[in-house]
Design a protein with these regions (language model features):
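N-terminal accessory beta-strand-rich subdomains and adjacent acidic, glycine-rich linkers
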Residues: 4-87
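An acidic-aromatic substrate-binding cleft motif
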Residues: 59-141
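Conserved, mostly hydrophobic/aromatic
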Residues: 134, 210, 237, 330, ...
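Aromatic- and carboxylate-enriched substrate-binding clefts and catalytic-loop regions
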Residues: 145-320
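Glycan-recognition and catalytic regions of carbohydrate-active enzymes
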Residues: 340-387, 423-427
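Carbohydrate-binding surface patches
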Residues: 371-411, 452-453
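Solvent-exposed beta-strand/loop surfaces of large extracellular or lumenal domains
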Residues: 415-439
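C-terminal beta-strand-rich structural cap/linker in extracellular carbohydrate-active enzymes
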Residues: 433-459
C-alpha cells in the first residue's frame, strides 16, 4: 500500500506518519500568519507563526484526491501512474515547445574542470566550457545554478559582473544548447511575471526554483502560479526543495521535473552512516509513484562502503559506476541531470556516450522485478530501442531477466555491468555486446551496491 494525493490547489498538503504498528495519522500545515525573510542566503520566507486553520477557500471548493494504491507485489508500485491520471487535465493549449532532455550541471561537481586556461567558477568562460561539452554530446541544456545572481539580494535582475547572460544565451543558441536558470523561490515570487517575461525574451528555456521547503496552502498556491506564469512565457519549471509531485505536471506540462527526493546532492555532505544505496532501491516504489524525480545522478567518482566519504568540492556516489548508468533508466526524469564535470566525463568517454544516448521520456515502461529495499529492474522503450536498468542494495545479486517483451527477431544488447573488482573498486565495470538468446532470458550479476544498464536493439 502507498498513500498519495493530487489536485491540492488552495489547501495544504497532508503527510502520512507511521504511529506504531500499522496505524497511520495525517498532519496538515496550517496557514501562515506571520513571516519573515531569511533562510539560506536570505532566499526564503520563513513562517514565524501559523493560524489555527489549514486552508481558506470557497464553500463549494473541490477537495483534493486522497488515494491508497494497492498492489499485488512491490514491482507494480514502480510503474503506477494513478497520481497523474487523477490530476486535473492540462490547461495548456500548446505544449509543442516543451523539450525534455538532459542537462549539464555544474553545482554538484563544484565547477570542477581542469586543463583549461581560465579560472573555473561562476564566469562566462566556465559556462561556455559547459556549453561546448553539452553540444559535443547532444545534451540539450546547461544550467546556471546558484551564484549567477548577486548573493543575499533575492533579486534575479542583479547579475554578478562575471556573467553576461545575453552573451551566454547567444553562444548556447549557436551550439543548439538551451540555458536554464536556478532561482531561489522568494526572488522568483517577488515579481514572477516580470522575471518570466524578461528571461523568456532573452532566450532562457526554464527555471529551477528552489528552497520552498513548505507545503502549506500559501506555498501550494505558489507552485500553481509559478507553473501558470512560466507557461505563459514558454518556460519550463523544475521544482527543487519542494514537496512531492501531486499531478501539477499534468495540469501544466511545463512543470518538467521535481526534486522532493534524497538525491545524489546529499553525497556532498552526508556522513558514512547515510545509506544512499538502500534508499535508491526503496524510493522508486514509493516516492516515484507520485511523479518524476530530479535525483541528479551521473557520478564518475564512485565508492563502496569502506571508501565513501563526503566532499563538497570532489563529491562521489555510493555504489558502483554501473549503478549510476542504470539510474538513468530506473528513475523517471524528463529533465535529467549529468551531475559530474566535463573533465570527468571526457575521461570516461564510454560511459558518457552511453548516458548521452538514453532518452528522458518513454513510450512504454515495464517494471520487470523488484523488492522494496533490495533490488529493482525497469525496462523502458523509445521507438524501437529498449533500455533496461537494474539496481541492488549492498548485497551482491544475480538476476535472470525475462526479455520476452522484445518479440520476434534478432536482438543485440549493449551491456554495462559491474567489473569483477567492483566490490573493492566501485568504478570498475565492463562493457559487452551480446546477442539476446532465443529463450529471451539474460542473466546479470551485480556487485555490492551495484547495477547493470542495457541498450537493446534489433540487428
Amino acid at each position: 500500500l502507498v498513500g498519495s494525493e493530487m489536485c491540492i490547489r488552495d489547501r495544504g498538503m497532508f503527510l502520512i506518519n507511521r504511529n506504531g504498528g500499522t496505524a497511520l495519522t495525517s498532519a496538515f500545515a496550517a496557514v501562515p500568519k506571520t513571516k519573515k525573510q531569511g533562510g539560506h542566503n536570505q532566499l526564503q520566507i520563513l513562517v514565524t507563526e501559523r493560524e489555527n486553520y489549514i486552508a481558506s477557500c470557497q464553500p463549494k471548493a473541490k477537495l483534493p484526491w486522497r488515494i491508497i494504491v494497492v498492489a499485488r507485489n512491490d514491482k507494480e508500485l514502480a510503474d503506477n501512474d494513478m497520481v497523474y491520471k487523477l490530476a486535473a487535465p492540462s490547461r495548456m493549449k500548446d505544449i509543442s515547445w516543451i523539450r525534455p532532455g538532459k542537462v549539464a550541471w555544474e553545482w554538484w561537481n563544484h565547477w570542477g574542470i581542469k586543463g583549461v586556461d581560465f579560472e573555473a567558477g561562476i564566469n562566462n568562460e566556465t559556462y561556455m566550457h559547459y556549453i561546448d561539452f553539452a553540444s559535443r554530446h547532444g545534451i540539450e541544456y546547461v544550467i546556471l545554478d546558484e551564484g549567477w545572481a548577486v548573493n543575499l539580494k533575492a533579486d534575479l535582475f542583479q547579475i554578478v559582473p562575471e556573467i553576461d547572460l545575453k552573451k551566454l544565451t547567444a553562444y548556447a543558441r549557436q551550439k543548439n544548447v538551451g540555458l536554464i536558470l536556478w532561482a531561489g523561490y522568494h526572488a522568483f515570487a517577488r515579481d514572477m511575471e516580470h522575471v518570466c517575461k524578461h528571461y523568456s525574451e532573452m532566450g532562457i528555456k526554464g527555471f529551477k526554483i528552489d528552497f520552498m521547503d513548505r507545503d502549506d496552502q500559501e506555498m501550494v498556491d505558489f507552485h500553481y502560479r509559478a507553473a501558470e506564469i512560466a507557461a505563459k512565457y514558454k518556460l519550463m519549471v523544475d521544482f527543487h526543495g519542494t514537496y512531492k509531485p501531486t499531478g501539477l505536471n499534468r495540469t501544466y506540462p511545463n512543470v518538467i521535473n521535481y526534486e522532493a527526493v534524497h538525491g545524489l546532492e546529499q553525497m556532498k555532505w552526508s556522513d558514512i552512516h547515510t545509506d544512499q544505496v538502500t534508499y535508491d532501491v526503496t524510493m522508486p516504489f514509493i516516492r516515484m509513484l507520485a511523479g518524476p524525480v530530479d535525483y541528479t545522478q551521473g557520478a564518475m567518482h564512485n565508492a563502496n562502503k569502506r571508501c565513501y566519504h563526503s566532499s563538497m568540492d570532489t563529491p562521489m556516489s555510493q555504489g558502483t559506476r554501473c549503478r549510476q548508468l542504470a539510474e538513468y533508466v530506473v528513475f523517471e526524469s524528463p529533465l535529467n541531470m549529468l551531475c559530474d564535470s566535463p573533465t570527468n566525463y571526457d575521461r570516461e568517454e564510454e560511459c558518457t556516450e552511453f548516458i548521452a544516448t538514453i532518452p528522458t521520456v518513454w513510450e512504454q515502461t515495464i517494471a520487470m522485478n523488484g523488492e522494496i529495499g533490495k533490488y529493482i529492474t525497469m525496462a523502458r522503450r523509445k521507438g524501437d530501442v529498449w533500455y533496461v536498468g537494474s539496481l541492488t542494495n549492498w548485497d551482491a545479486r544475480t538476476l535472470t531477466l525475462d526479455l520476452s517483451f522484445l518479440g520476434a527477431g534478432r536482438w543485440k544488447a549493449e551491456m554495462f555491468h559491474d567489473g569483477v573488482n567492483a566490490n573493492r573498486l566501485a568504478s570498475d565495470y565492463q562493457k559487452t555486446v551480446t546477442d539476446i538468446p532465443a529463450s529471451r532470458k539474460l542473466t546479470v550479476k551485480m556487485a555490492q551496491g551495484g547495477g547493470c544498464a542495457l541498450k537493446i536493439y534489433k540487428e
